[in-house]
Amino acid sequence: MELFASDQGRGVALVAKADGEPVGTCLLAESEIEPNHDVSPWLAGLFVVPEHRRKGAGAVLVRAIEDQARQRGFSRLYLYTTEAVEFYARLGWTVVDHTNWKGFDTALMVRDLSQPGADKENAA
């Protein structure tokens, strides 16, 4: 799997490719539009095409965004998720709050970037 980055100052867009075809994306963003928690930066927009899910692409993208945040001097990274709490927990993320966003129970999660990652084999 190859990763391609578009660096936009404090933000980064990553694209994962397999056999030359895009299979996933993820962003490092300075802020999230909603719901509103006053923290930064954010892992946002993680998406893997269905036929490449559960093959490790999501974990590779998350780890790459974590590395990008570390390189920019951040000690923590945040995200919102409605359905993938267990996935992120396997990667070392922790739920710190819940909010109701448009009728969905949404978890605010944090990753302490000074801590090593969780078991990568269980993350896929």
Residue ranges and their predicted role:
Residues 17-19, 111-112:
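Active-site beta-strand termini and strand-to-loop segments that position acidic
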Residues 1-13, 23:
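Active-site rim helix/loop that mediates acceptor-substrate recognition in acyltransferases
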Residues 88, 93:
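Conserved active-site tyrosine of GNAT-family acetyltransferases
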Residues 13-15, 21-31, 42, 47:
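Conserved beta-strand in the GNAT
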Residues 75, 79-84, 98-124:
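C-terminal "cap" of GNAT-fold acetyltransferases
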Residues 52, 56-64:
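Conserved acetyl-CoA pyrophosphate-binding loop and the N-cap/start of the following alpha-helix
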Residues 11, 38, 43, 104:
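Short coil/loop residues immediately preceding or within conserved phosphate-binding loops
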